[in-house]
Amino acid sequence: MIGQTIVHLRLAFLVTTVALCNVCVAQSSATAQSAASPKQLLVIGEEKGYRHEAVSHAMATIERLGRETGLWSTTLRTDSEALTKKKLEYNAKNLNDFDAVLFFTGGDLEMDAQQKADFISSIHDDGKGFIGVHSAAITFVDWPAYGDMIGGYYDEHPWLTFDAPIIVEDPSFPGMQQFPHSFVLRDEIYQMRNYSRDKVRVLMRLNVSKLDMKNKNVHRTDGDFAVTWAKMYGKGRVYYTSLGHVDANWDKPELQQMITEAIKWTMRLSNADVTSRPLPRNEPFYPGCSTAR
């Protein structure tokens, strides 16, 4: 009887050991696969005209976030050469090698007509992701296809760098959960033209009840000052945020999490609803409401 019990215990131990080994092997394989095949992100920090001091810090932060999470590998460029599907010399990467492109740019980048066509096609037709940060909305302001893709263009920053009163309009979107419903962040927020919330999913907007609407540079009369949005462009996913002008903000965990989730979403590592929604007018933050504050 004792001998049979020992045999049964040994068998049970062996079965458990084998099961645990299988789990470990599976986990190791999954980890190795993840480490061996991160997504590829191209970050462009080229500016023509005004130079933003935060660009270098932002690029370094985005590279670090990808490396630390293991989710993406980052290629940093301060030129536009890689924005093409054409084979480049010296084994340089082109758009075909990336899952998403991030712009912290400004002005008319040095791209010929074929590069522009390749860039738009890579998002609209190939389904690659695009993330636009801050001055990406002052890029190619005379190129309608780019404006249609990103969702809007810069039209002054009436309040310059100020304590911006921000409302999180869609707390369910990845990267919004860490923010309170309303908060203040010192940054430079753009007023937008060629923008319509009918074409985007607004994630953050300014609280107009706390703005100086008598500022002579205020052009919008609808009270819709979007700060961050997401949208589809053909097959591609597009994300834009006006945040990022202030260098120190790139050290804030909340902003880093927002950018991480934005990149993940554009790379299809997460999903979210980007159906457009009307400007809320039934909450205490809307100036037309009797409880506005």
Predicted features and spans:
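Bacterial N-terminal signal peptides that target proteins for export
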Residues: 1-13
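Catalytic beta-strand/loop cores that center a nucleophilic Ser/Cys/Thr
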Residues: 73-75, 152, 157-234
